């Protein structure tokens, strides 16, 4: 499997850090550096799931977003929101942040934990009490680029859709535009990260071609038009965290011979699952996996994943090698892999991401400036 630890979301955020005079962690993207030059007010607008294939499917070539196209970049591996947005917001790869996937095995809990929520993925049980810090803050704390920019006495903030941010906007074209404009209007130099969780949610529920998805993509474009018109002194960067594909599923629980070799529940992602194998059963697992699923998934040993820098380059976060098992598999096409016995609710989405296809990985960047 080829890895793409270059020209990525990580490098894009390092271009932003460089523009604001903050020390960078990785290489920047030269064509973005050139466009940012001299711009003191910058807004990065991320629409979840709106990768290259979705933009090009639902918008015409002469549309507002596509007519401002600058370059195509890579998401993280796996191309999934928790890994990709964390990498963009820190300027570091998943291996450095510890945020590899939607859910990860946390050894001290002996559970799969949804990092965004501190919830047991397999049972739905909350693992913290109200008011307690998130599990991710304990094991994989991060410093975001808005904090780094603020540290050098320049204004920076995040605006996230409610209820992700409690005082965040509920409506994109009214509250979203107004909240952003009100923040920008009195600033001479600032950075804003604006996040909206559509069209990702609509694609999960309906698949990628559905009219609801097209509606959300066009709504995103209307937001960018409106926000840019109201803030002509600001440079806007349009990006996504990943693309989407329509999916089907295999259930490994239906294969008792291979399922019996697992020592723990599947972890990471349905399109990039990781497997903890019972002692001495690794070769048997490898043989059976390739027999049943080799046409659809690429199986990678833990050692090879580390050597090939599958989850990115840089200094590994303490404990990150404990969150995935003896093998990682990634989808070559339309399939995901589940173990139905382990799911407390059947969240089998019609559209998904986090696999190994170009459609999930590639992100078109558009920049709007005067």
Stretch-by-stretch model annotation:
Residues 1-370:
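Feature captures the catalytic ectodomains and active-site-proximal regions of enzymes
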């Amino acid at each position: 499997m080829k890895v793409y630890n270059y020209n990525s979301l990580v490098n894009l955020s390092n271009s932003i850090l460089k523009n604001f005079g903050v020390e960078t962690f990785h290489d920047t993207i030269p064509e973005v550096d050139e466009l940012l030059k001299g711009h003191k007010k910058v807004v990065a607008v991320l629409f979840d799931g709106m990768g290259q294939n979705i933009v090009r499917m639902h918008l015409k070539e002469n549309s507002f977003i596509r007519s401002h196209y600058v370059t195509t970049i890579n998401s993280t591996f796996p191309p999934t929101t928790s890994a990709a947005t964390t990498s963009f917001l820190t300027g570091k790869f998943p291996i450095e942040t510890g945020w590899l996937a939607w859910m990860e095995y946390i050894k001290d809990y002996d559970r799969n934990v949804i990092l965004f929520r501190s919830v047991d993925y397999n049972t739905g049980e909350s693992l913290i009490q109200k008011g307690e810090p998130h599990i991710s803050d304990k094991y994989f704390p991060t410093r975001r680029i808005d904090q780094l920019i603020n540290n050098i006495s320049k204004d920076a903030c995040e605006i996230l859709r409610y209820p992700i941010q409690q005082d965040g906007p509920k409506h994109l074209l009214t509250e979203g535009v107004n909240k952003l404009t009100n923040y920008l209007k009195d600033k001479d130099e600032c950075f804003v990260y604006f996040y909206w969780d559509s069209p990702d949610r609509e694609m999960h529920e309906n698949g990628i071609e559905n009219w609801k998805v097209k509606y959300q993509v066009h709504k995103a474009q209307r937001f960018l038009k409106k926000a840019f018109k109201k803030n002509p002194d600001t440079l806007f960067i349009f990006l996504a965290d990943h693309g989407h594909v329509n999916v089907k599923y295999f259930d490994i629980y239906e294969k008792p011979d291979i399922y019996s070799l697992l020592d723990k529940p599947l972890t990471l992602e349905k399109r990039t699952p990781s497997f903890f194998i019972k002692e001495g059963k690794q070769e048997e697992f490898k043989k059976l996996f390739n027999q049943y699923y080799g046409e659809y998934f690429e199986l990678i040993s833990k050692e090879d994943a580390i050597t090939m820098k599958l989850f990115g380059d840089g200094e590994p976060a303490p404990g990150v090698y404990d969150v995935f098992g003896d093998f990682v598999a990634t989808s070559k096409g339309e399939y995901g892999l589940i173990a139905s016995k382990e799911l407390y609710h059947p969240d089998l989405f019609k559209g998904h991401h986090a696999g190994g296809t170009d459609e999930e990985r590639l992100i078109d960047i558009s920049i709007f400036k005067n």
